[in-house]
UniProtKB/Swiss-Prot annotation:
Record GO biological process: D-cysteine catabolic process; ethylene biosynthetic process; stress response to cadmium ion
Main location: mitochondrion
Keyword Ligase included in the entry's annotation: no
Record InterPro entries: ACCD_DCysDesulf, D-Cys_desShydrase, TrpB-like_PALP, TrpB-like_PALP_sf
Active site (record annotation): S120
Free-text function comment from the UniProt entry: Catalyzes the production of hydrogen sulfide (H2S) from cysteine. Is mainly responsible for the degradation of cysteine to generate H2S, a regulator of stomatal movement and closure. Has high affinity for D-cysteine.
Family of the protein in this entry: Belongs to the ACC deaminase/D-cysteine desulfhydrase family.
Protein name: Bifunctional D-cysteine desulfhydrase/1-aminocyclopropane-1-carboxylate deaminase, mitochondrial
Lineage: Eukaryota, Viridiplantae, Streptophyta, Embryophyta, Tracheophyta
Cellular component terms (Gene Ontology): chloroplast; cytosol; mitochondrion; nucleus
EC number(s) stated in the UniProt entry for this protein: 3.5.99.7, 4.4.1.15
Requisite cofactors: pyridoxal 5'-phosphate
UniProt induction comment: By drought.
Length: 401
C-alpha cells in the first residue's frame, strides 16, 4: 500500500507540474479565431461586458519557482511567464489586444492606430496582431527631438514593427507632452478617415476599460492553475510592473473579486503612484466596479532615472538575475519591478518573511537590444580559445593548414 501511495503522490505532483503550465489549453485551431466571451462568474456584474475575444496569445502561461538571491527565510517567490505569450506577440500587451482587436473587427475597422515610446512593446504587439488579422497599422512613436526627423532604425521592437509593415510616425517627446496622446491619435484618425480608411484607435499600452479585461482573465487563469494543484498553494502577494495602468487594474480587480485575494504590488516605471491610483480608478469606474483603487493595489515608485532609463545598478541586477536563474528580465518594465521588489524586501525583510509571492513577467525582451551599449561593460565572460600547435588537426598533429 505504501508503494501505491508513493506512486499516487508522484502522479499528483506530475499533474500539478503540468497544470501550472496548462489548464484547458486551446487547440491550434482556436488560434486567430474570434469567439463569444463569457466572463468569470465573479466579474459578471461589471459593465460593459465584452461580447467577443480573439485568440492571439499562447495561454495559459507557466508558473514556476524563482529562486532570486536575497529572499528572507521561508519566503517563496514564484514567477508567471507572460513573456511566453508568443514570439512577436510576447508579453502582457497581447492579453489586452485579444479584447481590443475583437472590437476593432466588430466595428469593421481596416486600420489600427496606437501610440507609445520608440521601443514600445505594445506598439510592436499591436502591429503584429493587426497584420495577423489583415488590418493596416499606424504607430505614433515618441523619440528625442534630435532623432524625430531621422530614420528610426531597426533595433529591437522597431525591427519587428517594420518587418510586418507598420506605418511609423515619429514625434518628439516635447510634442507628445504638449499635445497629448489622445489628441495625437485623433489627429491621425481624422487624416486617415479623409483618405477613406476606417481606423480604430487603441490608447497607450492598450490601457482602457476594455483592455483591462485581459488581466481580469489572467486572474481567472491563475485561479485555474492553482486549483489543479494538490498542495493548496495560495499566493499572499502578486507583484507586477506598471507602465500604463491597464495590467494592474485588471489583475488587482480580478484578485479582489475572485478567489485569489492576493495583495497586489505594482512598481511604476514612469509616472508617480498618485497618477496611477487616479488612472486605475478611472478604469475601474469605467467598468462600474464600485471599488477604490487604493484598496486593491499598492503602487510603488520604481521609475529611477525615468521611463526607459536605467542606472548601472538596475542593469547589473538584470545581468545577475539572468546569470543566476536563467530568467531574462527586460530593463524597462520587469527588470525595474523585480529590482524594486528586492529593495522593498531588503528594507523590511520581516514584512515579507514566510510569504508566497507571484511575480508576473510582462515580457519586453526585445527592449534589451536598445541597451546593448550600456550592457556591454557587464559582459566579460568571453575569451579567445587556445588552439596552439599542440592541439591535433584533422590531417596531423601541429599542422595549421
Amino acid at each position: 500500500m505504501r508503494g501505491r501511495s508513493l506512486t499516487l503522490s508522484r502522479v499528483k505532483l506530475e499533474l500539478a507540474r503540468r497544470s501550472m503550465s496548462a489548464t484547458s489549453v486551446p487547440s491550434m485551431a482556436d488560434f486567430l479565431t474570434k469567439k463569444p466571451y463569457s466572463p468569470p462568474s465573479w466579474a459578471s456584474h461589471l459593465r460593459p461586458l465584452p461580447s467577443h475575444t480573439f485568440s492571439l496569445a499562447h495561454l495559459p502561461t507557466p508558473i514556476h519557482r524563482w529562486n532570486l538571491p536575497g529572499l528572507p527565510n521561508g519566503t517563496e517567490l514564484w514567477i508567471k511567464r507572460d513573456d511566453f505569450t508568443g514570439m512577436e506577440l510576447s508579453g502582457n500587451k497581447v492579453r489586452k489586444l485579444e479584447f481590443l482587436m475583437a472590437e476593432a473587427v466588430d466595428q469593421h475597422a481596416d486600420t489600427v492606430i496606437t501610440i507609445g515610446g520608440i521601443q514600445s512593446n505594445h506598439c510592436r504587439a499591436t502591429a503584429t496582431a493587426s497584420n495577423y488579422l489583415n488590418l493596416n497599422s499606424h504607430l505614433i512613436l515618441r523619440t528625442s527631438k534630435l532623432l524625430a526627423d531621422e530614420d528610426p532604425g531597426l533595433v529591437g521592437n522597431l525591427l519587428v514593427e517594420r518587418l510586418v509593415g507598420a506605418n511609423v510616425h515619429l514625434i518628439s517627446k516635447e510634442e507628445y507632452s504638449s499635445i497629448g496622446s489622445e489628441a495625437l491619435t485623433n489627429a491621425l484618425k481624422e487624416k486617415l478617415e479623409k483618405e477613406g480608411k476606417k481606423p480604430y484607435v487603441i490608447p497607450v499600452g492598450g490601457s482602457n476599460s476594455l483592455g483591462t479585461w485581459g488581466y481580469i482573465e489572467a486572474a481567472r487563469e491563475i485561479e485555474e492553475q492553482l486549483n489543479y494543484r494538490p498542495d493548496d498553494l495560495k499566493f499572499d502577494d502578486i507583484v507586477v510592473a506598471c507602465g500604463s495602468g491597464g495590467t494592474i487594474a485588471g489583475i488587482s480587480l480580478g484578485s479582489w473579486l475572485g478567489a485569489l485575494k492576493a495583495k497586489v504590488h505594482a512598481f511604476s516605471v514612469c509616472d508617480d503612484p498618485d497618477y496611477f491610483y487616479d488612472f486605475v480608478q478611472g478604469l475601474l469606474d469605467g467598468l462600474h466596479a464600485g471599488v477604490n483603487s487604493r484598496d486593491i493595489v499598492n503602487i510603488h515608485n520604481a521609475k529611477g532615472k525615468g521611463y526607459a532609463m536605467n542606472t548601472s545598478e538596475e542593469l547589473e541586477f538584470v545581468k545577475k538575475v539572468a546569470s543566476s536563474t536563467g530568467v531574462i528580465l527586460d530593463p524597462v518594465y520587469s527588470g525595474k519591478a523585480a529590482y524594486g521588489l528586492i529593495n522593498e524586501i531588503t528594507k523590511d525583510p520581516k514584512c515579507w518573511e514566510g510569504r508566497k509571492i507571484l511575480f508576473i513577467h510582462t515580457g519586453g525582451l526585445l527592449g534589451l537590444y536598445d541597451k546593448v551599449d550600456q550592457m556591454a561593460s557587464l559582459m566579460g565572460n568571453w575569451s579567445r580559445m587556445d588552439v596552439s600547435e599542440s592541439v591535433p588537426r584533422k590531417d596531423g598533429v601541429g599542422k595549421m593548414f
